[in-house]
Amino acid sequence: MGVHPQLNKNGELQHLLTTEGLPAVILRHILDTAESFTGVTERDVKKIPLLRGKSVFNLFFEPSTRTRTTFEIAAKRLSADVINLNMAVSSQTKGETLLDTVDNLSAMHADMFIVRHNQSGAAHLIARHVRPEIHVINAGDGWHAHPTQALLDMFTIRRYKQDFHALRVAIIGDILHSRVARSQIHALTTLGVPEIRVIAPKTLLPAKVERLGVHVYHNMVQGLQDVDVLMMLRLQHERMESAHLPSTEEYFKYYGLTPEKLALARSDAIVMHPGPMNRGVEIDSEVADGTQSVILPQVNFGIAVRMAVMSILAGN
């Protein structure tokens, strides 16, 4: 492989593992390709033959409904054969190693692995291990990265705001446990967003988060002033220790997005959420269902973005 673990020797995308270090030209190419696929979802026949004859294996070692479903829909729209494996109850529980599992599936002529795992670095490990004709997409690994979520977020921002170069973007909530936040920050920076803010209590921020080039706020009143894009994050109770948080009610009081807090941002600001959403914890229903929310379009764009990634990896 080339200088970057995701690129081949020609500088083309070989795997999608993280947004960190991905060149802007590749990020833009994915977004442009996704734009060309949005029309497919509007057609009577929602299929194009770009992945016909290819086998795509969904390896989800962590539960997921939305991400797994959108990957499956995206692959099927490209005419791929999709094999869904519930890894949580399969060979892994019988003691087979991750790479043994991958070797066995590779022997079944897999062309692409879509991997979600609770261990950071799992997708990188698989990418280093597989034959060069097999492509790996990271669908979320531990606290580390979730690149396709960040890409669909970038696509959504570009749809509503056109240009990245004059935006103030705030990421609000459980930054500490969020692989989405890390991927968003890397993508926003690469695409030229001049000001990225993170707003969270100190207990929900990673150490030295400022090194990522973000402005840190612990207060919504200050942090939301003149913001163009609000990216809400859920509290990840499954990755959290009780010490991180007094109560969800108290969290909502200070960090939940209400109409009153949203009014501090720009009047044309958009509200995003990667899902699943906890109403009454990080976001008020009135905001989630309101005119500034783009949460449902985000989900829809996820299909086109994942189609784009798979299509580019397959050499189209």
Swiss-Prot record:
A Pfam family reported for this protein in Swiss-Prot or TrEMBL: OTCace
Pathway: Pyrimidine metabolism; UMP biosynthesis via de novo pathway; (S)-dihydroorotate from bicarbonate: step 2/3
Catalysed reactions listed for this entry: carbamoyl phosphate + L-aspartate = N-carbamoyl-L-aspartate + phosphate + H(+)
Keyword Lyase: no
The protein's Enzyme Commission number: 2.1.3.2
Domain of life the protein comes from: Bacteria
Binding site for carbamoyl phosphate: R66, T67, R116, H146, Q149, G275, P276
Family from the record: Belongs to the aspartate/ornithine carbamoyltransferase superfamily. ATCase family.
Protein name stated in the entry: Aspartate carbamoyltransferase catalytic subunit
Source organism per UniProt: Nitrosomonas europaea (strain ATCC 19718 / CIP 103999 / KCTC 2705 / NBRC 14298)
Upper taxonomic lineage: Bacteria, Pseudomonadati, Pseudomonadota, Betaproteobacteria, Nitrosomonadales
Gene: pyrB
